[in-house]
């Protein structure tokens, strides 16, 4: 009688365990390296022709309104509308240092955080003339 040994299952389990323990500390270290974010609050409204934004905290501007075609992004920072290749080098310690793009989509708004946000991308449904508040950490309900 021959005994056939099956090592494929234990080897697979060992490989998964090594992979888990090898990547775990790297992922934890990455999460703990988030920079200190300064607070900002902005209310975003989708209009028939574009986007309206009202800053409640952390920026030099109070109201922004601009026309956008669907899927054409507009960069916004603490000083207002900007271009990604022409971001202001002036840094005011009394303002939040943020930069993101806002894009009007068929069903809502898409935001991409470039600087000064904990979020990389926010995407949400927004009907015409409906409002949504955001801050450095993401979407908020109270403002």
Model regions and ranges:
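Short amphipathic alpha-helical "recognition" segments used for binding
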Residues: 6-8, 49-50, 108, 132-134
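Sterically constrained small-residue positions within well-ordered secondary structures
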Residues: 20, 33-35, 44, 91-93, ...
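Bacterial Sec-dependent N-terminal signal peptides
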Residues: 1-32
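Sec-dependent signal peptide cleavage junction
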Residues: 25-52, 136-143
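A mature extracytoplasmic/lumenal domain signature
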Residues: 46-48, 55-59, 66-72, 80, ...
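Mature extracytoplasmic or organellar-lumen-exposed domains after removal of signal/transit peptides
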Residues: 98-100, 107-109
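A low-complexity, Ser/Thr/Gly/Pro-enriched, surface-exposed linker/loop concept
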Residues: 30-33, 64-98, 127-143
């Amino acid at each position: 009688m021959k005994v056939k040994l099956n090592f494929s299952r234990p080897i697979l389990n060992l490989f998964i365990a090594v992979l888990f323990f090898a990547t775990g500390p790297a992922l934890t270290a990455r999460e703990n390296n988030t920079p200190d974010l300064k607070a900002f609050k902005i209310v975003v409204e989708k209009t028939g022709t574009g986007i309206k934004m009202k800053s409640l905290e952390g920026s030099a501007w109070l109201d922004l309104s601009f026309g956008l075609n669907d899927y054409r992004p507009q960069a916004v920072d603490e000083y207002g509308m900007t271009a990604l290749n022409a971001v202001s080098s002036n840094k005011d310690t009394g303002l939040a240092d943020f930069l993101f793009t806002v894009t009007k989509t068929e069903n809502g708004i898409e935001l991409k955080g470039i600087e000064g946000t904990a979020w990389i991308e926010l995407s949400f449904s927004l009907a015409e003339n409906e409002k949504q508040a955001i801050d450095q950490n993401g979407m908020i309900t109270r403002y």
